[in-house]
Amino acid sequence: MIHSHNNNLSFCSQLITVRKMAALTRALPAPLHTSTTEYEEVPAPLPATPGPQLPKYGQRKGWKPKTAADFNGGGAYPECHVAQYPLDMGKKNKGQGSTLALQVDQDGLVRYDAIAQHGRAPGSRVQSSFKDLVPLANRTDVTESERQMERPDDLSVAETAERTRLALERITHGKIKAAQPKHVPKTNSDATYIRYTPANQSADEGKQRIIKMTEVQEDPLEPPRFKHKKIPRGPAEPPPPVLQSPPRAATAQDQKDWMIPPCISNWKNNKGYTIPLDKRLAADGRGLQDVHINDNFAKFSESLYIADRHIREEVRARAQLQQLLAQKQKTSKEEELRLLAQRAREDRSGLSSSVSGSVAAASASRLPAETGINLGGYGSESGSEEESDEEEEDEEAIRERNIVREEKRREREKEMRMSNMGSEMRAKMLAKEANRDISEKIALGLAKPSASKETLLDSRLFNREALSTGFASEDSYNLYDKPLFAGSSAAAAIYRPAGSSRNDESFGGGTEEGIKEEMSKDRFQLGNATRGFEGAEGVEAREGPVQFEKDTIVALDGSADPFGVEQFMDAARRGGKRTAEDRDEERRKRARDE
């Protein structure tokens, strides 16, 4: 109530004042001149620069305050687990570093001589370039005044001497101060004068004294009078509360993760303990690394498997082809022998030559063309030659017939050699003749063709494996694992018994008595003896040298024992007890001695 009354009084007083000012304005005359008031232009306030955008509370994960503006005049953020220095508190000021800035010369090249000039006096000169080794008389970057090397004037000499004297004094004063005692308190030897007026004015009125105050001289070697006592430490602050989860039992995986392997040395074992292999590997730390297997191993294995399968298929097809060729060769040989036997029977029976010639020609037409076997001209062609011999006795015809006979004799020798070969060697020879390189043939009457790159390479050597270095490894025990003349015709030529007939007496010389003698022998094994040694009738014929079998000594566990160590140890363990084998050996020795 009182407060509202006071407000009404103040409002009335203001209204009266306004009315008095209006009455005074009406009483005053009008002004003759209008005046303009000049106001200073107040500059507009600059727009406030926006401060850094600080993330709100709860959204500061991963945010790092770096500048002083990030703290916004406040303290550190406890939810940011990084080093923070609000208002640069606790931040160590780094001194001036010794790192040199990269400098370049007028050509833009790096000045490496700045390292040699670092830390020296400003006027000192360091010779750090190649031009410093060149005499001044031969240098082009030096002026004539620098070459003359004039003496300095008296003023520069005096300045240098004064600068040297001051430097020596600083060094001397430093040495003297280092020898003086330290921590000596400085005393003020000046006396202080004090005007003293006594307070009791009744005794001596207006009597004043002048007192001189000086400090008492102290002995610098006097021991300290007071002893500093350490204040006992106050009670410790209560530890901050830490929210902890309730204790739980450790699982096997937790115990395995927290397991620290024992420290086992790979070089020392002074006590000679037997350390298990798993403990040693655990101390090595290799179990902490994950093993990553490259996918290329699987790809490589798959490629090898596919290549092996293709090669096996090719080898199987090649073997089938060789078997087929051998079968055809065998069939042709049997047909040839059958024709020879039929011709011999016809000759003995006295049949006409025309009938035998027609039969021989018909049989020769049935022979397979791919075998390339010739019957030696026992057909109608030979009969025609005999008739021509009877009709014409010309020397030229005789010479031609001799040439034909020589060619046929060579063919018969080749057929005989092929008949004595095995099926495998015959198939190899046929395959070799089928795959002959024809680049060596020369076309007669034509220009020599230019050699191409394809003819310079022998395709028969592409799939052959080269010999390894040294022909065998050091630890191999297979020095005689292959026969001496394996797969070659040399063995058949060396170990074949020499025939009694010469080249001109093949097939009995072409006479009836010779053919009968040849047919009386074993017709299916041409070139072999009809009679051998006693007891060798059931032995199969060999086409090469005698092959011996390798004695392999087998240990008790089934592995190879080339030196007989296991047998020696077994005999030693038995302690010299004689076995049945030893008794048999001794019995054989006695029988031999008797």
From Swiss-Prot:
| Record's compositionally biased regions (Pro residues) | 44-53, 235-244
Per the record, where are the segments of Basic and acidic residues compositional bias? 398-417, 513-523, 578-594
Q: Does ATP-binding show up as a keyword for this record?
A: no
GO BP, sorted A to Z: mRNA splicing, via spliceosome
The reply on keyword Nucleus is yes
Q: What are the start and end residues of every segment in region (Disordered)?
A: 36-63, 223-254, 370-426, 498-523, 566-594
Write out the annotated subcellular location.
Nucleus
Specify where it is mainly localized. Answer: nucleus
For this UniProt record, the keywords arranged alphabetically read as follows:
mRNA processing, mRNA splicing, Nucleus, Spliceosome
Which InterPro entries is this protein grouped with? Answer: SKI-int_prot_SKIP, SKI-int_prot_SKIP_SNW-dom
Q: Name one GO cellular component term.
A: spliceosomal complex
Q: What's the domain of life for this entry?
A: Eukaryota
Compositional bias (Acidic residues) spans?
Answer: 383-397
The function of this protein is:
Involved in pre-mRNA splicing.
Q: Which family does it belong to?
A: Belongs to the SNW family.
Assembly behavior: Associated with the spliceosome.
Q: What is this protein called?
A: Pre-mRNA-processing protein 45
